[in-house]
């Protein structure tokens, strides 16, 4: 969220699930006065990430494009958001991905003209399946940001991340 705010990305919508009330309290305290909205996936325990994405998309105000960043990837650099933004074509619906060592990573910047299709997509593989249907719209930009690799799924990963970045 810090990197997004430093780039001027606003508003930011956060979809909450497990321990959502605790996380909401922390975010409200830390980001008081920012354009941060929180919505809930109350069925998080029985649904997938695509469901949370659809809930978030249903809550965002009209926009030209939006970044999609899972909450367990907290250290994506400001420069990555800016590079992906600059790579986005102006007049063509596109999905711009940062790449690291040739792999597509988060956060993609997605043209808002894809929102209705995402909201109605029920195919296999979640959004990966959706991307495959829209390969012709994908734009990539190489970045040098280990934050694009940093995925915190365990407490051990979280601890290493805190040690590295807050040191």
PLM ranges: what are they?
Residues 18-19, 44, 48, 79, ...:
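Short beta->alpha linker loops
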Residues 25, 54, 82, 128-129:
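Active-site phosphate/pyrophosphate- and oxyanion-stabilizing loops and adjacent acidic/basic residues
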Residues 37-38, 45-116:
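Conserved beta-loop-beta/alpha segment of the NTase-like Rossmann-fold superfamily
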